[in-house]
Design a protein with these regions (language model features):
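Positively charged n-region of N-terminal signal peptides that target proteins for export
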Residues: 1-5
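Lipid interaction determinants
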Residues: 25-118, 122-343
Length: 343
């Protein structure tokens, strides 16, 4: 056991595993930058942000310009920044009402999205006259038409990270809300678990059918959600964002209608929590301890078990196979480690 010193790292729908090897992975490109591309200050600021943080509160500015704690704060979530230049966040209101059926009604979907934040992508620290800020380049998010480059001023207070969304004019002085996060410590991970740590993007999914130990069908690679993220961190946490590439229509207004919310819900999925790797099992598997989920769940965390194979930069995940009428069916998700971004 040893402490992880490497990068940080995001699955929703259950897919099932099959037999056979998966594609060999290429080497992950190393991080390179010339002296003209990066300043010592920028390097330092990225390093300062790197980590996984737990949501601990929100504040709003009153008429006198004083920051006040948000009354009845009751949300949970994590934000994580990697040394390779990527970030992800999930924030969920607590005490949500589960759906009455297997699929939500339009009204239930609208309620499920209220107060839920989830997005992912690269990040870039910078500075202007108002202070230091980080831009979250959101390549994926729940809101189909949400802001792509989200500017957040940041400050540190001991182990706390304070993120202040910029005002409409891009300033900090006119900002009226901020979010409080607490840095989490890294934990001892096994050598196998360390290989999970990092940010990966989805390449494709597949499905298969077997009969009497022989593969009778193997579906084509499905790339409809390619580019989604799965993240494993040195703190023992994970999160996943699964987003459809096509068919996501922006809302007509600032708040979605019930039908717009249902369409957004169907095209985006994700959860967050801790992870545990069982490399000694046969076959080996990883458990995603789901503390929060886009789909409202009962208060108790749900454990999602995923069989896995690691092959260089590629991580293959899938649920356990299902057997019915003499046939075994399953599927996989193939995730590739993202390369380090130049600073």
């Amino acid at each position: 056991m040893r402490y992880v010193k490497s990068a940080l790292f995001v699955v929703l729908a259950i897919y099932l595993p099959g037999i056979g090897d998966f594609p060999a992975a290429g080497a992950v490109p190393s991080q390179t930058s010339s002296p003209n591309e990066v300043s010592a200050q920028t390097e330092s600021e990225r390093a300062k942000l790197v980590g996984t943080y737990k949501l601990i509160g929100r504040e709003t500015k009153d008429a006198n310009g004083t920051w006040q704690s948000t009354p009845n704060f009751n949300s949970s979530g994590y934000i994580t920044y990697s040394v390779t230049g990527y970030m992800g966040v999930h924030v969920m209101p607590n005490d949500r009402t589960p759906f009455t059926g297997a699929q939500p009604t339009a009204h239930e979907a609208k309620t499920a999205l209220e107060g839920y934040t989830a997005y992912y992508g690269p990040f870039s620290p910078d500075e202007d006259a108002d202070g230091k800020f980080v831009v979250h380049h959101r390549v994926g998010q729940i809101n189909p038409g949400g802001e792509v480059d989200a500017k957040r001023f940041y400050d540190f207070a001991s182990d706390r990270l304070i993120l202040t969304p910029a005002a409409a004019d891009g300033s900090k002085a006119r900002a009226t809300r901020r979010v409080l996060w607490e840095r989490l410590p890294e934990v001892p991970l096994s050598d196998e678990a360390e290989q999970f740590v990092g940010f990966r993007q989805l390449l494709y999914t597949d499905r298969y059918t077997e009969r009497e130990g022989r593969q009778v069908t193997h579906g084509q690679q499905n790339e409809s959600r390619a580019g989604s993220y799965i993240i494993y961190t040195p703190t023992g946490h994970m999160m996943v964002h699964l987003m459809a590439q096509e068919g996501r229509t922006p809302y007509d207004g600032a708040i979605p209608t019930a039908e717009e919310a249902l369409a957004a819900y169907r095209s985006f999925g994700g959860y967050f929590g801790r992870f545990t790797v069982h490399e000694g099992a046969s076959p080996p598997y990883v458990v995603h301890h789901q503390e929060g989920h886009l789909r409202p769940r009962p208060n108790a965390p749900t454990d999602a078990e995923r069989l896995y194979q690691l092959n260089g930069a590629i991580l293959r995940l899938g649920g356990r196979p299902r057997m019915s009428n003499g046939e075994t069916t399953g599927g996989h998700l193939y995730w590739e480690m993202l390369p380090a971004r130049p600073e």
